[in-house]
C-alpha cells in the first residue's frame, strides 16, 4: 500500500508540472485572426506600398481618370486617391515557415491581395509573429518590392 501511495504522489506531481508548463500562454500563431488583422493593418497603413501602387496603375477606372486629367498635379491627386481606396485581403492559406526553439517566434508566408477599383494585385507576404516575455504578441511584415 505504501508503494501505491508513493506512485500516486509522483503521478499527481507530474500532473501539476504538466498543468504549470501550459501556464506560459499560447504560442504565436501564423493563422490567428489577430495575426491576420495585424498583417493587413501593417501593409494598409502604408498608402504608397508597391502592391497598391501596382493595382492602381493597372486599374482601367484609374487609367480613364488619368487620361482626362490635364496637369501633373491632377494626375498625382488621382493616383493618391486611388491608393487610399485600396482594400486588402490575406489569402486563406498561411504557411508556417519556421518556429524558434523556445516557441516564442514563428515566421510565416501568405498571399496578400490589394484591390483598387477594378484591378487586383497579388503578392506573397512574409511576416514574423513574436511573443514577448510579458505575453504580448507582435507582428512584423517583411517589406516587399515588385
Where would I find each of the regions flagged by the language model?
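Sec-dependent bacterial lipoprotein signal peptides
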Residues: 1-21
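Cystatin/cathelin-like cysteine-protease inhibitor module
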Residues: 23-146
Amino acid at each position: 500500500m505504501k508503494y501505491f501511495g508513493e506512485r500516486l504522489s509522483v503521478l499527481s506531481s507530474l500532473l501539476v508540472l504538466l498543468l504549470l508548463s501550459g501556464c506560459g500562454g499560447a504560442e504565436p500563431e501564423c493563422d490567428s485572426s489577430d495575426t491576420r488583422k495585424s498583417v493587413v493593418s501593417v501593409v494598409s497603413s502604408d498608402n504608397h506600398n508597391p502592391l497598391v501602387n501596382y493595382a492602381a496603375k493597372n486599374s482601367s477606372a484609374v487609367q480613364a481618370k488619368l487620361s482626362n486629367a490635364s496637369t501633373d498635379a491632377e494626375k498625382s491627386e488621382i493616383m493618391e486617391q486611388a491608393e487610399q481606396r485600396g482594400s486588402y485581403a490575406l489569402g486563406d492559406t498561411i504557411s508556417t515557415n519556421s518556429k524558434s526553439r523556445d516557441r516564442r517566434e514563428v515566421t510565416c508566408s501568405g498571399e496578400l491581395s490589394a484591390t483598387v477599383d477594378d484591378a487586383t494585385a497579388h503578392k506573397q507576404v512574409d511576416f514574423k509573429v513574436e511573443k514577448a516575455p510579458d505575453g504580448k504578441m507582435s507582428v512584423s511584415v517583411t517589406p516587399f518590392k515588385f
